[in-house]
Every structure is written in C-alpha cells, then in structure tokens.
Amino acid sequence: MLATGIKNKIELNVTDKNTAKAVGSGTLEVYATPQMVNLMETCACFSVEPYMEPGKTTVGISLNISHVSATPAGLKVWCESELTAIDGRKLTFNVSAYDEHGLIGEGTHERFIVDIQKFMAKTQGTVSYTHLRAHETLSDLV
C-alpha cells in the first residue's frame, strides 16, 4: 500500500559520460547537476512504482534541489529518497545524494500519479501544453 515512509536507494559510478563537460552543463569533468537530478528522480520514481495500480504511473512535476559538492569521475554516487507526503495524487519526496566523501545534493521532489493511457493520449496531440487555457492545470490533463 502506498504510504509515507517508503524509501529507496540507487547508486552508480561517475564516469566521463556523466560529467558536466560531457553533458554540456559546464566545462569541468565533475558529476553533472542534470545527472544528479536524473538520479534523484529515478530513485523517487522507482520507490513507488511497485505500489501503483495497473495502468498508473508517476510523472515528475517539481524539483527544489541544491548541488552542494563536486564529485570527480571514478567515485561512486548514490541517492536516497523517502516519500514524505501524499496529497491526493501528488507525492512529495525528500531526496539526498552522496558520494564517498559525504553529501553532494539534497532537496525535495514532487511526482503526480497519472493514468498512463489518458496521459499519453493527451500528450500526443489532443492537448498541448502550449495551448493550455489560463484555467487549466496539470490536474486537467490527467
């Protein structure tokens, strides 16, 4: 059952392919912020996926994170997530990323539970984000 307190941890090794220089988010050969964000989203997403009803999944809707320490290629990094709030279909997670020396990033991430078929039908042309009327919200799309 989906409930607050669900935790997850995933890890990876920093390689030349996920540095700021390689992904274009900077010029240095250190773990890229966009890659850390991806790790955080993936960690949160897969923590709750086993609890989704058939035909449902989650989509990311917000991130508020800080990247507080650089990590060179060759080190292991990992993310830990915890589901801290459930508000209808909106899920809020605390996310933290670490390397072998300590904390490298932290913050909050929100995801929204959606019906897969409905969501994909709407994103494939029946509703475009660029054509949203002022009164429409993400909830209207799912």
Regions from the language model: what does each represent?
Residues 38-42, 46:
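Short, residue-level hotspots on alpha-helical faces of the histone-fold
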Residues 45-78:
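Hydrophobic beta-strand-centered segment that forms part of the acyl-chain substrate-binding groove
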Residues 130-137:
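Conserved small/polar residues in nucleotide/adenosyl-binding loops
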Residues 102-106:
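C-terminal structural segments of small proteins and small subunits
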Residues 65-100:
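Hydrophobic beta-sheet segments that form the core/acyl-binding groove
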Residues 1-31:
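Catalytic strand-loop segment that frames the active site of acyl-thioester-processing enzymes
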Residues 115-122:
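A short, polar/charged loop-to-alpha-helix boundary motif
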Residues 110-114:
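Short beta-strand edge segments in extracellular beta-sheet folds
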